[in-house]
Amino acid sequence: MAKNYYDITLALSGICQSARLVQQLAHQGHCDADALHVSLNSVIDMNPNSTLGVFGGSEANLRLGLETLLGVLNASSRQGLNAELTRYTLSLMVLERKLSSAKGALNTLGDRINGLQRQLDHFDLQSDTLMSAMAGIYVDVISPLGPRIQVTGSPAVLQSPQVQAKVRASLLAGIRAAVLWHQVGGGRLQLMFSRHRLTTQAKQILAHLTPEL
């Protein structure tokens, strides 16, 4: 059966978008607010009608992730910011595989996400309350599956509880995207053997987005 590289590329961009948000937060203490909203909302929406629907139904919502994906696919150096992004992306994929083989953790994750939906009736998606709740899910359900993702950045920035919560919430969104990636036919071997196909697809999607002003 032929792979749907459009859906695979969208889901992979979702993982990369989370990785980029983590990097921005860890180094700067803030991140692309629109991209963060899209990624966090992907965790909450339990019944999307398509792969693109997970990310709000618009390719433009994944611009940051698509640009990051191209950087990861074409990274020649094992050092620097692209190496960081590659490490975060691969680590999220590893954790997702561990999650998918742990039925108890999957059930717990579903229950906790249902709880988030109830909180959304009273709090904004990017409120400290929701951020802390998402971070708590990551710490309680995902982190114990191991290995832990080592986030690197500014030590002063990473001491902030608000930044820590946003980083963990972004990692939770990355796990959501990694689950989706496998559901639509993604696999780590594609990063080695289908790099050109993924690069071409990501460039095609970016090409027909309206330029940012």
Curated annotation (Swiss-Prot):
Any Pfam family matching the protein: DUF489
InterPro entries xref list: HflD, HflD-like_sf
Annotated membrane topology: Peripheral membrane protein
Gene3D superfamilies: HflD-like
Gene Ontology CC: one annotated term: cytoplasm
Residue ranges that the Swiss-Prot or TrEMBL entry lists as coiled coil: 79-122
Keywords: Cell inner membrane, Cell membrane, Coiled coil, Cytoplasm, Membrane
Localization per Swiss-Prot or TrEMBL: Cytoplasm; Cell inner membrane
Signal sequence segment: none
HAMAP family referenced in this protein's UniProt entry, alphabetically: HflD_protein
Family assignment from sequence similarity: Belongs to the HflD family.
PANTHER family reported in the protein's UniProt record: HIGH FREQUENCY LYSOGENIZATION PROTEIN HFLD
Name used for this protein in its record: High frequency lysogenization protein HflD homolog
Naturally occurring in which organism (per UniProt): Salmonella dublin (strain CT_02021853)
